[in-house]
Every structure is written in C-alpha cells, then in structure tokens.
Amino acid sequence: MRTRLWDAASAVYERLLTREIDGAPAHVAVIQDGNRRYAREHGDDPTDGYQSGARTTERVLEWCSDLGVEELTLYAFSTENFERPPDQQQHLFDLLESKLREFADADRVHADRVRIRAIGDTGRLPQRVRDAITYAESRTAGYDGFTLNVALAYGGRDELLTAARGVADAVAAGDLDPADIDAQAIESRLHTSPVRDVDLIIRTGGDERTSNFLPWHANGSEAAVFFCTPYWPEFSKVDLLRAIRTYESRAASWRQTRAKRALALVRALGSEVGEARRVLDRFKGALPDPPEDVEAETQSAD
C-alpha cells in the first residue's frame, strides 16, 4: 500500500515538474556514482550494482532525448578505476563491451539517430573494449539527432596535461608559434574534442564534488551543478527533472545579472553623453566660426 501511494505521488510530482520545464540544457554530463554502495546495501555483489546502474543509464538516455537534451556525457570509467581490484575491472570491461555493442544495435538509437562517441585515453583499455568502441562509433557515425559521449579511461587533470604536452611538442617542433597559443590550441588537443560546453553536471550518490570531470568544458560555460543523494541505480526521472529545474533557475539568474549589467552600462554611457553635450553647449558660443573656404567645401560636399 505504501509503495503504491509513493509511486502515485511520484507520478504526480513528475508531471508537475515536467510542466515547469521551459527548455532543457543542450549538454548534460553525469557522474554515475553509488553503484557499489547500492549493491552493498542490498546484500549484492558489486557486479550486480553495475548491472543495475547500466539499466538506469538506458532510461536516462531515453529521458534526455525525450526532454530535448541534445548531448549527454556519461562518466563510465575514470582513470582512477584502473586502481580497483582486477576482478572488478574485468567485470566493468565486460559490461562496457556488451553495453556498447548493445547500444549500437538498439532500435531506438537508430530511430533517434543517436551518435555514440568514446572520449578519454581509450588506448589504455583492453583490445576487446576498444573493438566495441570502434563498432559503436562506426555504426552511428552518420547520425546527428542526439550525441552520447561515453567517458572511458577519462581524467580531467590527465586530459589537460595531455593537451599541454601536445602544445609544448608542437612549439618544440616549430609547428606552433608561442604567440599563437590560444584557447583553440588547447581545446583541439583535448580527449573530448569536439564536445560542446557543458550546461549541467549531475552527480548521484550524495558526494558534493565534480571529480574533475570535463573541467575545460564545464568552466567554459560555468555549468550548473546538481548533487543528489540517490545512488545511480536509484536515479529517477524526477531527479533528472529537478536537476534541469536547477539549471533553469541558474540560467534565469544569470540572464538577470547580465541584464542588470547592461542596464548599468547604458545608464553610465547615457550620463557621460549627457555631460559631454552640456560641456559642448557651454563652450559652443566661444568656438570660432569655420573659414569661408572650409564652409564652402562642406556645402559642396553636401
């Protein structure tokens, strides 16, 4: 009885939140945290938690597409994950391999024209996972309806260091003038190139940190951040809608701030123009008349 009441209340709340949404963020990035803790609290193995999380990933992909999100980036395997026990790594590799191939063959992926891309230092992954990446990317390479980025062997600090080394190597080789180093020189050497700036970062599992996820693209757009307590397998559409509402609130606040700044600038400029006119009027009578030849040239030019 209690479960039915909760489900009914959640459905009503979901409809209310959906009505409040007035435009989804273009790019959402998700840190999928809490799979192992979810499994532990349910008396299951960590592998069961990852399987449950994978099912949530499928649902979130559908929700984002339905809500008008254009790009979704999932933090599937970080560089820190290489430090986990070998058996956990192998299970994650098994799951990644199977899900990449499954997504690449899914009817909805092709119906919605979803392009799948892997971002990160993928050369560190086992060959079978790299083969699955190649399969998924090649199967969806021509699509432009929605973009799904899967961050694999990804670390934000590692990405920036790699880009910096690439710039240094280009300068040393004489291919890049130090004076020409700009944001584009860095961005073109990122693992994530080309990826649009992030509008909203979501982290599940209760931790309030972004784990250096997409630092270049998140800071570039000053992305909104939404932390929530549900573990990734528990993440619901209501949680996603609440995150988007947070993004919209922040975007509205930023628009208001920019409008206030623009108004203040207009007022300042208006004050300066008014003062200049008053000074000009004050000295207008003291200014000498233009010479006759200058006046004649002016009239002929008219």
Curated annotation (Swiss-Prot):
Q: Which UniProt keywords apply?
A: Magnesium, Metal-binding, Transferase
Gene3D superfamilies in alphabetical order? Decaprenyl diphosphate synthase-like
Q: What molecular functions are annotated in GO for this chain?
A: magnesium ion binding; prenyltransferase activity
The entry marks the following residues as binding substrate, namely 34-37, 78-80, 82, 84, 203, 209-211
- List the signal peptide residues: none
Keyword Magnesium in record: yes
Top enzyme class: transferase
PROSITE patterns found in the cross-reference section? UPP_SYNTHASE
Q: Which residues form the active site?
A: 33, 81
- EC annotation from Swiss-Prot or TrEMBL: 2.5.1.89
Return the cofactor note field.
Answer: Binds 2 magnesium ions per subunit.
Top-rank taxon: Archaea
Subunit structure and binding partners: Homodimer.
Q: What does this protein do?
A: Catalyzes the sequential condensation of isopentenyl diphosphate (IPP) with geranylgeranyl diphosphate (GGPP) to yield (2Z,6Z,10Z,14Z,18Z,22Z,26Z,30E,34E,38E)-undecaprenyl diphosphate (tritrans,heptacis-UPP). It is probably the precursor of glycosyl carrier lipids.
The record's family statement is:
Belongs to the UPP synthase family.
Would you tell me the protein name for this molecule?
Answer: Tritrans,polycis-undecaprenyl-diphosphate synthase (geranylgeranyl-diphosphate specific)
